[in-house]
Amino acid sequence: MAYLSECRLRLEKGFILDGVAVSTAARAYGRSRPKLWSAIPPYNAQQDYHARSYFQSHVVPPLLRKTDQDHGGTGRDGWIVDYIHIFGQGQRYLNRRNWAGTGHSLQQVTGHDHYNADLKPIDGFNGRFGYRRNTPALRQSTSVFGEVTHFPLF
């Protein structure tokens, strides 16, 4: 099995891995009106790392103070949707599942590290070394150009 460091394992275990629970909660809230919660968090431009320089320019902060939006801003749908996304029933359900460690799977966490953990040798139709050994002459001598590998040939 692939080795994972404790820090990396802890970080990846904290990530939401249970897609079934997220899908079920999102489907249930998708039928309700008004749409207050979704699995995708609402976008807040003032908290976006890539838009930080725009909001720190010399023109924008006075405008934000004038419109009373200089306290971190809200998402497109307003503060109620932001509040319900953080403290609503759907998010509380997902938070409780993740705090308890539900939905954590070692195969999902190890990801690509787990892919080559237990390889078995593959012997194809032409043997261990592939197509270069499929004629009697090549089975007797390796190549007229010499060997280019340090692995055993026969």
UniProtKB/Swiss-Prot annotation:
It holds the Pfam family SPMAP1-like. Signal peptide: none annotated. This is Sperm microtubule associated protein 1. The lineage of its organism: Eukaryota, Metazoa, Chordata, Craniata, Vertebrata.
